[in-house]
Amino acid sequence: GTCPGCDLMEMWALHVDWANPGNSNLTALPGIQLTDWDQTLCGSGSDWSCMSQPGTSQKLDPIREPLHYPLQYRNFGTHETLVGCFAEDVDGLDRAAVHWFELRDTGAGWSLFQEGVYAPDEYNRWMGSIAMDDSGNIALGYSVASSALYPSIRYTGRLAADPPGLMPQGEASLIEGSGSQLTTSSRWGDYSMMAVDPLDGCTFWYTQEYANSQGNWQTRI
């Protein structure tokens, strides 16, 4: 987050020889440069909780450093894809946004096909999960909260023909939270999951956390 030009995806290729495990190998691939991002949400140190909630000084942990859920893979024959996302500080003031990306391999190795940062307003968005269906359409789900918005579940998306780097299909609410998390742990999510139904290849399923009026976390599919 403090080294311009240093933000990249590191990738490895794993070859497994089940008949002769000694022939298996793990090979580092060339790094893939992404647009520079600031991952220093909540500063440094042991307390990384800074996602505000209404009516309490207790804040939520944005899980700032890892990818939010494993990358999801598809093989379209002409190309392979990997989609993923993580949280970043979008304004330098600890406002969390979802940084998403799509990698492609058309036969010459993996490269960045598109990326974007979803931050349409002043709310924090984090703990995302992203998936692509059989037609190349993408759905992105995430947590959303602020000092004026209880922790809730929302989603957005893009069609395969939409302009690259954008989520222009608008934001929708799956469920609005009715309280703030008041338990002793500030951990939140760990993690959410967006998946495509294998029966039809186009129905997205999403599971995520939100807070109820009793100050307890709940999950919803």
Identify the residue ranges that each predicted region occupies:
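C-terminal PAP-associated
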Residues: 1-221
